[in-house]
Amino acid sequence: MRDMMGMMKQAKELQAKMKAMQDEIATMEASASSGGGLVTITLSGKGTLSALKIDPSLMKEEEVEILEDLIIAAHNDAKAKLEAAMAEKTQSLTAGLPIPPGFKLPF
């Protein structure tokens, strides 16, 4: 019975820590550039695009395809940075817990 109470307490503590971590992640931002800084993108912790800066030199009709590629590259880089930061925070929170390898938490 004591073990069950202890597990319930641990689960409640973990839930509170996860909520705090989710709140912290929501306030994070990740920025990335492509094309040597010609395009810069910033994503919020929730993954929404919060800023996009484009160098005026790319605002030419013949540069549209290059601009599209640079936006995609910057977005993908910013997303990867955000996911890495989230994984790092999640790992520190779940250290020592018996979670199977490859198990993805729902946030």
UniProtKB/Swiss-Prot annotation:
Lineage top rank: taxon: Bacteria
Q: What is the first-listed, main subcellular location in coarse terms?
A: cytoplasm
Signal peptide start-end: none
Work out whether the entry's keyword set contains DNA-binding.
Answer: yes
Localization (cell): Cytoplasm, Nucleoid
In the UniProt record, does the keyword DNA-binding occur?
yes
GO terms of molecular function = DNA binding
| Keywords recorded for this protein, A-Z | Cytoplasm, DNA-binding
A cellular component annotation (GO) from this entry: cytosol
| Record's subunit section | Homodimer.
State the family it belongs to. Answer: Belongs to the YbaB/EbfC family.
* Function per UniProt: Binds to DNA and alters its conformation. May be involved in regulation of gene expression, nucleoid organization and DNA protection.
Q: Which PANTHER family match?
A: NUCLEOID-ASSOCIATED PROTEIN YBAB (PTHR33449:SF1)
Question: What protein name does the entry list?
Answer: Nucleoid-associated protein Oant_0022
What is the source species?
Brucella anthropi (strain ATCC 49188 / DSM 6882 / CCUG 24695 / JCM 21032 / LMG 3331 / NBRC 15819 / NCTC 12168 / Alc 37)
